[in-house]
């Protein structure tokens, strides 16, 4: 009976909402968007440790992937609200082959790359992980050394 009640309420909410309701449940302090849940973490970690931290939540969790300017704007507002002045933020994009071939940790398509001017540059042949840059209002990206310590943005399928 409870399953039918939840399903019925979800359908009712979808019909009553102007945008439609997303019928999944994110943990209370996570941001729901496009069937996924997102959370920014202020603890500074290397890119690899941040990816490992995201994966510990459950299968299907990774550093976040962004696929449109609308996503970038929404996440810039979300990150700015939680990390005022706390530095750049790791996302799940990396050049694993070190040949300017950028890949997301969730294996989604690489279809949106809002790089800062003159980026990516693999500076000193040592920058292969991607961060959202704070002084661009968290709207543009830079490649950086994967060992740098940064806050990070996780995404999970719940």
UniProtKB/Swiss-Prot annotation:
One of its GO terms (molecular function) is metal ion binding. Residues 33-155 form the C-type lectin domain. Expressed by the venom gland. CDD domains: CLECT_REG-1_like. Disulfide bonds join 26-37, 54-154, 61-156, 129-146. Glycans are attached at residue 134. It is found in: Secreted. InterPro entries: C-type_lectin-like, C-type_lectin-like/link_sf, C-type_lectin/snaclec_domain, C-type_lectin_CS, CTDL_fold. PROSITE patterns: C_TYPE_LECTIN_1 (PS00615), C_TYPE_LECTIN_2 (PS50041). Residues 1-23 form the signal peptide. Keywords: Calcium, Disulfide bond, Glycoprotein, Hemagglutinin, Lectin, Metal-binding, Secreted, Signal. A motif (Galactose-binding) lies at residues 119-121. Ca(2+) binds at residues 119, 121, 127, 142-143. Gene3D superfamilies: Mannose-Binding Protein A, subunit A (3.10.100.10). One of its GO terms (cellular component) is extracellular region. Homodimer; non-covalently linked. Recombinant C-type lectin BML-1 is able to agglutinate erythrocytes. May be a calcium-dependent lectin. PANTHER family: MANNOSE, PHOSPHOLIPASE, LECTIN RECEPTOR RELATED (PTHR22803). Belongs to the true venom lectin family. This is C-type lectin BML-1. The lineage of its organism: Eukaryota, Metazoa, Chordata, Craniata, Vertebrata.
């Amino acid at each position: 009976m409870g399953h039918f009640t939840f399903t019925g309420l979800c359908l009712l909410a979808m019909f009553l909402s102007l945008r439609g309701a997303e019928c999944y449940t994110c943990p209370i302090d996570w941001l729901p968007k496009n069937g996924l849940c997102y959370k920014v973490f202020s603890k500074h970690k290397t890119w690899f440790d941040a990816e490992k931290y995201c994966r510990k939540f459950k299968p299907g969790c990774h550093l976040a992937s962004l696929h449109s300017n609308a996503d970038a704007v929404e996440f810039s507002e979300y990150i700015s609200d939680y990390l005022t002045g706390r530095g750049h933020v790791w996302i799940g994009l990396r050049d694993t082959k070190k040949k300017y071939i950028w890949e997301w940790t969730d294996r989604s398509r690489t279809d949106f790359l809002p790089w800062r001017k003159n980026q990516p540059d693999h500076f000193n042949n040592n920058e292969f992980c991607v961060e959202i840059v704070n002084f661009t209002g968290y709207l543009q990206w830079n490649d950086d050394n994967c060992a740098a310590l940064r806050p990070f943005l996780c995404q999970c399928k719940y």
